[in-house]
């Protein structure tokens, strides 16, 4: 089997977990054969915004077609 990894950043005004879910949900909606995800980094945007925005960087792996 051969896998490809992509790095995605999900965002949420609620929590880091919701931000990770945002990235994983998007990956599952747009990629086939998603197998696993790893949280790489987390951060909070606190600059010129009224509310904090949680960001979770997620590395998502999916199996390439015909890789068996």
From Swiss-Prot:
It is found in: Cytoplasm, Cytosol. Keywords: Cytoplasm, FAD, Flavoprotein. The record marks 45 as: May contribute to ligand binding selectivity. Induction: Up-regulated upon transition to the exponential growth phase (at protein level). Not up-regulated at the RNA level. It comes from the Archaea. SUPFAM superfamilies: Dodecin-like. One of its GO terms (cellular component) is cytosol. Riboflavin binds at residues 35-36, 55. May function as storage protein that sequesters riboflavin and related compounds, thereby protecting the cell against undesirable reactions mediated by the free flavins. Binds and sequesters riboflavin, lumiflavin and lumichrome. Can also bind FAD and FMN (in vitro), but has low affinity for FAD and even lower affinity for FMN. Protects bound flavins against light damage; Trp-36 rapidly quenches the flavin excited state. Promotes the conversion of bound riboflavin to lumichrome. This is Dodecin. It comes from Halobacterium salinarum (strain ATCC 29341 / DSM 671 / R1).
């Amino acid at each position: 089997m051969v896998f490809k990894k992509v790095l995605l950043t999900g965002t949420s005004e609620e929590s880091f977990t919701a931000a990770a879910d945002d990235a994983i949900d998007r990956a599952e909606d747009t990629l086939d054969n998603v197998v696993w995800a790893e949280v790489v980094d987390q951060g909070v945007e606190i600059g010129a915004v009224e509310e904090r925005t949680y960001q979770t960087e997620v590395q998502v792996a999916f199996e390439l077609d015909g890789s068996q």
